[in-house]
């Protein structure tokens, strides 16, 4: 760290101690909530910071609050000090100048992410972060299945590509489905399909996925998706005439043996559900061979945060090897670390060594190919097109 950055950080440590930080973050998962409480205990000990988890049902609630404060000219006493964010919500906050700039790239622990060679920490759904977000974790679309129903003995081969999934669902009607948009998981499956369907497209068409959806490019980009869904839907649960509302409902249908294959964007959710008896012991996790839709999630500081220095101390702690290793443990959260192991000391690397994983957990290094998220604007384009074509019967 340069002398200038060191002096800057010393000032932040001085100003950031002995304050409260209001951390607006989704509160729908008990494991994640418990991890945030652990982090709160650590920053209390290190900096006498009182980290308050303001639980959200949707991150857009925090976005709306900061936007309202800006409209009311509250430019320095905001209620949100730190927010868990990525994708469309980051795009909205960036577009409306609601975020503090050029701080995340100056955190001491940011260097552990190898930013010069790691686009995942410099871009969020294709949009440059410009130091407005500190990376916190990574997630990938993970599939899981009932190994009693799908195995060599039953002559039922596990589908490992999108095309194989279509063929499998055709041969096993009613055993697969996905939550309907705008559910996050349902949208993730549709984005995975869209990216895969364009793997053989021209570079110009593929480039459109990283750019804003427009009236001119929407039909051309989305037509392959509608053609695919027209083939897939008749093979789905309830003949594709009805879709579940959420990932939790999809998981219950697997537990009830109505579905044989499902998916999640939180791989640790699978072994956790098996341990809670919400899924059978025969469940196994795997990654699609043609690629796994993946993204990085971040923490950001609103431009009008009341305690921006304290929020930076918290964000830097969340990036520490200690905090990232704790977060990656399957029984804690199981969220993949954003740190690059080669940038760590042997002692720091040792923190990440774990015991034998649960049989239903995603095997280590299963994900061989990651797929980047399309531009956030494609979410609305897909959602509107899906509703027009398939939403009437819902």
Which residue stretches match the model-derived regions?
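Short, well-structured alpha-helical segments in soluble
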Residues: 66-75
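Conserved C-terminal helix/tail region of periplasmic/extracytoplasmic solute-binding proteins
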Residues: 3-7, 252, 359-394
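Non-transmembrane alpha-helical segments in soluble domains
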Residues: 13, 90, 94, 163-166, ...
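Extracytoplasmic ligand-binding site segments that recognize negatively charged/polar headgroups
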Residues: 26-38, 54-61, 76, 80, ...
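Short, polar/charged alpha-helical segment
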Residues: 8-17, 24, 29-50, 143
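Paired acidic/hydrophobic, glycine-rich loop segments that form the ligand-binding mouth/hinge
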Residues: 74-84, 259-266
């Amino acid at each position: 760290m340069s002398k200038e950055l060191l002096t800057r950080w010393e000032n932040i440590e001085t100003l950031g101690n002995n304050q409260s930080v209001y951390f607006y973050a989704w509160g729908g998962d008990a494991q994640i909530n418990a991890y945030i409480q652990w982090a709160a205990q650590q920053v209390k000990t290190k900096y006498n910071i009182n980290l308050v988890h303001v639980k959200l049902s949707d991150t857009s609630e925090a976005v709306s609050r900061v936007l309202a404060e800006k409209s009311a000219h509250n430019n320095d006493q905001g209620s949100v000090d730190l927010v868990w964010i990525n994708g469309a919500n980051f795009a909205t906050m960036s577009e409306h100048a609601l975020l503090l700039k050029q701080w995340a790239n100056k955190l001491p622990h940011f260097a552990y992410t190898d930013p010069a060679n790691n686009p995942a920490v410099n871009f969020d759904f294709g949009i440059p972060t410009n130091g407005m977000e500190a990376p916190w974790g990574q997630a990938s679309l993970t599939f899981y299945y009932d190994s009693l129903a799908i195995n060599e003995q039953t002559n039922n081969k596990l589908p490992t590509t999108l095309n194989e999934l279509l063929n499998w669902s055709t041969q096993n009607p009613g055993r697969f489905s996905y939550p309907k948009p705008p559910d996050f998981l349902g949208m993730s499956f549709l984005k995975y399909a869209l990216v895969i369907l364009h793997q053989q497209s021209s570079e110009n068409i593929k480039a459109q996925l990283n750019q804003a959806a427009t009236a001119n490019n929407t039909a051309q980009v989305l037509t392959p998706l509608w053609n695919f869904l027209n083939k897939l839907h008749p093979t789905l649960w309830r003949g594709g005439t009805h879709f579940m509302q959420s990932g939790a409902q999809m998981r219950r249908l697997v537990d009830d043996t109505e579905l044989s294959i499902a998916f999640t964007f939180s791989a640790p959710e699978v072994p956790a559900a098996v341990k809670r008896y919400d899924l059978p012991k025969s469940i196994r996790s795997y990654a699609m061979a043609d690629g796994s839709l993946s993204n990085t999630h971040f923490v950001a500081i609103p431009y009008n945060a009341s305690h921006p220095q304290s929020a930076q101390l918290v964000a830097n702690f969340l990036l520490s090897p200690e905090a990232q290793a704790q977060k990656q443990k399957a029984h804690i959260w199981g969220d993949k670390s954003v740190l690059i192991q080669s940038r760590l000391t042997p002692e720091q690397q040792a923190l990440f060594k774990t015991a034998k994983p649960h049989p239903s957990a995603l095997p280590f290094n299963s994900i061989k190919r990651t797929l980047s998220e399309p531009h956030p604007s494609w979410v609305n384009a897909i959602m509107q097109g899906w509703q027009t074509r398939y939403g009437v019967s819902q």
